Amino acid sequence: MITSTRLPQNHPEELYAAVDLGSNSFHLVIVRVVAGSVQIIGKVKQKVRLAAGLDDNMMLDNESLERGWRCLETFAERLQDIPRDNIRVVATATLRLAKNADVFTVKAQQILDHTLSVISGEEEARQIYLGVAYTSANQGNSLVIDIGGASTEIIIGNDMTPIHLVSLNMGCVTFKERHFAGDVLSEENFAAAIDAAKAMVDAVADKFVCFDWQQCLGASGTPQAITEILVAQGISDAIRLDYLYNLRQQCIDCSTLDNLIIDGLDESRRIIFPSGLAILIALFESLSIRDMQISGGALREGLIYGMLENMQQNDRRMQTIHQHMQHFHIDSEQAERVTEVALTLFKQLSEQTDVDGIDGEAMLVAAAMLHETGLHIEYKLHHKHGAYILGHVPMVGYTNLQRDGIKTLVLNHRQQISPEVFDQNHSETRGIMRSLVRVLRLACILSIRRKDNLLPQFCLEVEENDWRLVFPEGWLKAHPLIDAELANEKWQQHKMGWHLTCE
C-alpha cells in the first residue's frame, strides 16, 4: 500500500519571500508554510531588461538603473509584513558584469530595507538546480538548463545534489543586442547567434555529455515560451529539436521583430524570443539533447526552499498527492486499493512491453490516488471535473507533461474514452499513454466493490493491442458485478480499436 508522507510542521503559519533581480525580469515570490505545506500566495514579475542597459564598457545606463529602482519600490511594500530572516534578495548576471553595479545595489538596499547579494554564476546555477529539484520530478540524473537575460546556467545533478554546473555569459537580452540589433530576423543572424552560442557551449560540453542523464529540464524563460507556443499550436509534447527548427523558420518568415507574430507567443517575450531560441538550438545541438521538459521552479524557488531545509528529507510527489487527497476529501482506502491493483497490472505490462520514457509508473500512481478528485463536485461527470481540477492545481514533483498525462488518465478512467487526447502526444509516448489508460480503467473496475481482499491472483497477457485478463476458473461467474463491468469495458476498448479478453 502507498503510505502517507508529510512534512514536519514548524509553525502554524510562516511567510517567506524571494526576490530575484534577473537580467531580463525582476521577480518576487511570496509563500506561506502552513500545516507542513508550501503555498504560493503572491507572485510579481516585471520586465526591467537590465542587461539592455549595459554599454560597451560594461556600464549600466541611467534609464536601466531607474527602471530597476522603480520596480523595487513596488516590491518593497509587499515585503514589509514578512520577517527579515525569511527574505532573500539576490542579483545575477548583469550586476555581476556591470562595473557600476554598486550604484544600483546601494540604492536598491535602501529601497528594500534589506541586504542584496550579487551571487556568482556557480551559486546561481546551484540555486536554480535546487529550485528545479524541489518542484519537478526526480528521475535519476537530470540535466537542467536556464536561459536568462545575460547568462545561461547548465547543471547536471541527481536528486537534490548538483554534480557539475557552469554559468555562461550568454543570454536572451545580450544576444538580442549583439546578434539581432537591427531587429532583422534572417538566416544569417540566426546562424551567427547559434554559432556564437555553440562556441561557448562546446567549450564545456565534454563535462556534461559524459553523464547518462534520464531527463532534461528547462527552467522558465525561453523553454516556457516555446512550450506555450507548442500548446497553442496543438502540440502536447516535450521540446524537440525539430520543433525548434520549425520555430526558427517561423521567425525568419516574419523578417523583422516588428512583424514577429507566432501563435502562442506572448507579446512580453516577443523582442527576446529569437535570441533565446538561437541559444536553445545551440544547446540542443552541442549537448545532443533529445527532448526537454519544463520544470516547475527555478532560482527563486531554490532560494525559498533553501530557507526550508527540513523539506529536503521528504518525497515531494507524495506530499502533493496527500495534500490534494485531504483537500478534496478523497477516500484514501479506495485510492490505495485502486493504486495497488493498477501497480500489479503495470508490473505485468512492463514485463511484456516497453513502457519506459515518461515515468509512466509515477503518473499512474498519481492518477490512481487522485482519480476520485471530481467527486468533490458531483458523481455523474466526476472524471471530467477531476481532470479539470488537476489541470489547475499545483502538482509539485511533476513536470508539465506529466501533469497533462495525469489529467488524461483521470479524464479517461471511466465512461467513454476520449480518443482525441492521444493525438496531442508524440508518437513515442502515445502508445504508453493508451496502455496507462487501459491499466487504470481495469484497476477501477476490479476495485469497484471498495473492499480489500476480494481479488484473486490474476494474470495480464499482452500482445500489442490485444490484452487478455485471466482469473481463476469460475471466479468471474461468481462475481457477476465485475463480470458485467468488464463486459462493458470490452466494448469501450473495442471502439478504440483495442481488444480485451477476460476469462
Curated annotation (Swiss-Prot):
EC number(s) on file: 3.6.1.40
Catalysed reactions, semicolon-separated: guanosine 3'-diphosphate 5'-triphosphate + H2O = guanosine 3',5'-bis(diphosphate) + phosphate + H(+)
Entry keywords, A to Z: Hydrolase
Swiss-Prot/TrEMBL GO biological process terms: guanosine pentaphosphate catabolic process; guanosine tetraphosphate biosynthetic process; nucleobase-containing small molecule interconversion
Entry-linked CDD domains: ASKHA_NBD_EcGppA-like
InterPro entries: ATPase_NBD, GppA/Ppx_hydrolase, Guo-5TP_3DP_PyrP, Ppx_GppA_C, Ppx_GppA_N, PyroPPase_GppA_Ppx
Pathways involved: Purine metabolism; ppGpp biosynthesis; ppGpp from GTP: step 2/2
The keyword Hydrolase is assigned to this record: yes
Residue intervals passing through the bilayer: none
Disulphide bridges: none
GO molecular function: guanosine-5'-triphosphate,3'-diphosphate diphosphatase activity
HAMAP family from the UniProt entry: GppA
Family membership noted in the UniProt record: Belongs to the GppA/Ppx family. GppA subfamily.
Function of the molecule: Catalyzes the conversion of pppGpp to ppGpp. Guanosine pentaphosphate (pppGpp) is a cytoplasmic signaling molecule which together with ppGpp controls the 'stringent response', an adaptive process that allows bacteria to respond to amino acid starvation, resulting in the coordinated regulation of numerous cellular activities.
UniProt name for this protein: Guanosine-5'-triphosphate,3'-diphosphate pyrophosphatase
